[in-house]
C-alpha cells in the first residue's frame, strides 16, 4: 500500500430554502434562523464550519456550508442536528460533496491545503479527470501540473484547496478556491 499522508475531511453542502419558509411570519423565521445559528455554532466548537450565501448566484441553492473535520462522523452529527432544527424542516439539500485532503502525488512548492483564512467568497469546483489524462505518463502529467502551479503562483490572492472525493457521486476531486473578490478567480481560470 502506498505511503499517503492524509489530512482532514471536507464536506460541502448546498441548501435550498422552500418557499413555505418565506411565507412564515417574521417571528417564526427569526426563531428558526436563531436556532440554526446555534446549531452551527455548537458544531463549530469542534470543527471548522463556514457558511456562504448563494442567494442571487444559484437558482438551486440559497446557502452553502463548508465543514472541515478530522472525522466523517461529525458531518453526520451536524447534518442530523440541522435536519431536526426548525429551519431544517424547510431545507432541501441540492448538492453534497464529501472528500479528504491528502498530500498530492504531484510535486510543487505549495503550502498547507487547510482552510485558514476567512475569505469572503468560495468557489467549489467538483471535477473528474478524463480517461486521456490517465493515459498520459506520470512525467507528462507532472509537466501539465507544473504549468497549473506556475499559473496559480501568479494569483496569491486566490487560495486553492484540493481534496479527493469519495462517496456515491462521480466526482473525483473537490477543488475550492477562496478569495475576497470573485474577479480574482475568473482571472486565474481564464
Regions found by a protein language model. Name each.
Residues 14-16, 66-68, 176-178:
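Short hydrophobic/aromatic beta-strand micro-patches
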Residues 47-53, 157-164:
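A short linear hydrophobic-aromatic micro-motif
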Residues 58-62, 91-93, 120:
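Short connector loops at helix/strand junctions that flank enzyme active sites
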